[in-house]
């Protein structure tokens, strides 16, 4: 249980407090001595104690006031020694009342700092913080009794002026920095994507990326050499005029155009190697390309998948777009076309069913899926030439169920020159199954291909004479069709059929690529391998008969 203090205990505690000495605030502020020695002295300082303290400070300097008792034997605490030195014994200490200048400085410092006596004493040498505090407290009481303001009006006006000056200096500095930024052109307006798009649409020569796309450039380079060159020149001119607006974009497009030019040169060399070359007109000095599956005005090349000599026509030649295109696809995207490997023979036959033959007075209403419109003009022209003029004998072959609707081939006057040259080199019948200038490789005895017939091509033997002639300067490159062979698929006449991975054996494809990558591809084409065996695989058998007619320019 807690013991309750009795009245006798309280009286004893009170008596002890009365008997204990009272500390002098002015002379001592330290704690009583806790050791076994004599207690610390309190009260006013004597002259002997002042002399001991001054001598110690001169020897050891100010600081470490607690060591004075140990080193000098002075029975005073450290706090009492410090206050005696600072307030009474310092050599630079000022005695007496404050001057008018010191009073004005104290008022100004107090208006700025407040009750920071030690900081104010640093601005008043020889004056202690205690003296400054006593002066300020005495002044406040006097002003309150007189009803005067604590700070005079002059000090208040000076303080307000200083505040306004500081604010004005800050504003001037901020305005100066803004002026410098504007003078140096460093003003950065707000930028949004909407404004950029609106400004780019208003540019006079801001080209779109689609205008110089890879597919368009490739399609133009395969369609016409002059068309590709002029388009690239126009696009380059537009890019040069827009260099000041979009320099980074023009550099990128120029790099694309240069890479496409290099690809066009490589593709030209490849076309010459596989017989995909220009057709030389007898009455024209320009080269007009006839791509696979298509034809030009006045030409009868590749009507039914077989090569025939072209006939010069009267009147200007009209450059047409290549007919190697689907009605549902982009004309310039034929490189992306691939043959679906899962199609059955019946699916390949259906789109190419032959329509009834048209009369000479009425154009045929049938249109090939690849030749929309252009094939009808060729049929109409062939019928007109056959009925109106007495030219060479037209050879009409029976069409297979996989061939295109038109199977009529007209022999041109250059056909006689080719026939004479072939008879000089190879005596014998001219129109045979190995003649490269025959208008149609299939005769009437060729049986039609049914829907279930397999598309298998065998290796055919060639005679030494033929192999020797094929190894000469006038190289002939074309497939040999045996009477039992089937007709190739029309879609395999497309240029991309050479590169389809699902139509040829890998070894045959590698041999074909090795032949294409040989030296001087445009002149020296070596189709004969080994002991006079020519590959009639699906990829090379699908190629039409082609021949370089450089001597008949």
Curated annotation (Swiss-Prot):
Induction: By gibberellin in aleurone cells.
Phenotype of the disrupted gene, per the record: Plants are not defective in root and leaf elongation, but present shortened internodes and defects in pollen and floral development. Delayed flowering. Male sterile. Defective in anther and pollen development.
CDD domains: SANT (cd00167)
Lineage: Eukaryota, Viridiplantae, Streptophyta, Embryophyta, Tracheophyta
Organism annotation: Oryza sativa subsp. japonica (Rice)
Tissue specificity comment: Expressed in aleurone cells, inflorescence shoot apical region, stamen primordia, and tapetum cells of the anther. Expressed at low level in roots and vegetative shoots.
Functional description taken from the UniProt entry: Transcriptional activator of gibberellin-dependent alpha-amylase expression in aleurone cells. Involved in pollen and floral organs development. May bind to the 5'-TAACAAA-3' box of alpha-amylase promoter. Required for anther development. Functions in parallel with UDT1 to regulate early anther development. Functions upstream of the transcription factor TDR and may positively regulate its transcription. Required for pollen development. Probably required for controlling tapetal cell size and promoting tapetal programmed cell death (PCD) during anther development.
Domain HTH myb-type stretches: 37-89, 90-144
Disulfide-bonded cysteines: none
Swiss-Prot/TrEMBL keywords: Activator, Developmental protein, Differentiation, DNA-binding, Flowering, Nucleus, Repeat, Transcription, Transcription regulation
Stretches with biased composition (Basic and acidic residues): 1-17
Main subcellular localisation: nucleus
Compartment(s) of residence: Nucleus
The name this protein goes by in its record: Transcription factor GAMYB
MF terms (GO), sorted A to Z: DNA binding
Ranges annotated as DNA-binding: 65-89, 117-140
Region annotation (Disordered) ranges: 1-45, 464-489
Any single Gene Ontology cellular-component annotation: nucleus
Annotated Gly residues bias: 27-38
Single biological process term from Gene Ontology: cell differentiation
Assembly and oligomerization: Interacts with MYBS1.
InterPro entries according to UniProt: GAMYB-like, Homeodomain-like_sf, Myb_dom, SANT/Myb
Taxonomy, superkingdom: Eukaryota
Pfam name, any one: Myb_DNA-binding
């Amino acid at each position: 249980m807690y013991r309750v203090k009795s009245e006798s205990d309280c009286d004893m505690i009170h008596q002890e407090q009365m008997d204990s000495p009272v500390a002098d605030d002015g002379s001592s502020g330290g704690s009583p001595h806790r050791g076994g020695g004599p207690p610390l002295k309190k009260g006013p300082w004597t002259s002997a104690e002042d002399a001991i303290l001054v001598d110690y400070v001169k020897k050891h300097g100010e600081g470490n006031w607690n060591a004075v008792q140990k080193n000098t034997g002075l029975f005073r605490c450290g706090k009492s020694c410090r206050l005696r030195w600072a307030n009474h014994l310092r050599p630079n200490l000022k005695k007496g009342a404050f001057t008018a200048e010191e009073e004005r400085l104290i008022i100004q410092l107090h208006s700025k700092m407040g009750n920071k006596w030690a900081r104010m004493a640093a601005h008043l040498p020889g004056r202690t913080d205690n003296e400054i505090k006593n002066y300020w407290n005495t002044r406040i009481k006097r002003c309150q009794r007189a009803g005067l303001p604590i700070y005079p009006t002059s000090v208040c006006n000076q303080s307000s002026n200083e505040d306004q000056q500081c604010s004005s200096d800050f504003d001037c500095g901020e305005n100066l920095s803004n002026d410098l930024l504007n003078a140096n052109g460093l003003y950065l307006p707000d930028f949004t994507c909407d404004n950029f798009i609106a400004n780019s649409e208003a540019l006079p020569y801001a080209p779109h990326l689609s205008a110089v796309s890879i597919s368009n450039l490739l399609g133009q380079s395969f369609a016409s050499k002059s068309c590709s060159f002029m388009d690239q020149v126009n696009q380059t001119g537009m890019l040069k005029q827009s260099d000041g607006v979009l320099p980074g974009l023009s550099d990128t497009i120029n790099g694309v155009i240069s890479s496409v030019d290099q690809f066009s040169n490589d593709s030209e060399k490849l076309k010459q190697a596989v017989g995909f070359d220009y057709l030389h007109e007898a009455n024209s000095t320009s080269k007009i390309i006839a791509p696979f599956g298509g034809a030009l005005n006045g030409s009868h090349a590749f009507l039914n998948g077989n090569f025939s000599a072209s006939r010069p026509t009267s009147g200007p030649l009209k450059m047409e777009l290549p007919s190697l295109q689907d009605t549902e696809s982009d004309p310039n995207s034929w490189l992306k076309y691939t043959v679906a490997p899962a199609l059955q023979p019946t699916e390949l036959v259906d789109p190419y069913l032959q329509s009834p033959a048209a009369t000479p007075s009425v154009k045929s209403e049938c249109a090939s899926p690849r030749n929309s419109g252009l094939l009808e003009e060729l049929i109409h022209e062939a019928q007109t030439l056959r009925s109106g003029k007495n030219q060479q004998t037209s050879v009409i072959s029976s069409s297979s169920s996989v061939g295109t609707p038109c199977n009529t081939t007209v022999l041109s006057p250059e056909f006689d020159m080719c026939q004479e040259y072939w008879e000089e080199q190879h005596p014998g019948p001219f129109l045979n199954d190995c003649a490269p200038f025959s208008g149609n490789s299939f005769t009437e005895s060729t049986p039609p291909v049914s829907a279930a017939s397999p598309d298998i091509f065998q290796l055919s033997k060639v005679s030494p004479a033929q192999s020797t002639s094929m190894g000469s300067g006038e190289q002939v490159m074309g497939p040999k069709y045996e009477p039992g062979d089937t007709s190739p698929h029309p879609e395999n006449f497309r240029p991309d059929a050479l590169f389809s991975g699902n139509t040829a054996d890998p070894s045959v494809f590698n041999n074909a690529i090795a032949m294409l990558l040989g030296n001087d591809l445009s002149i020296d084409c070596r189709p004969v391998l080994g002991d006079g065996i020519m590959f009639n695989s699906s990829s090379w058998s699908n190629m039409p008969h082609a021949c370089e007619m450089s001597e008949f320019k």
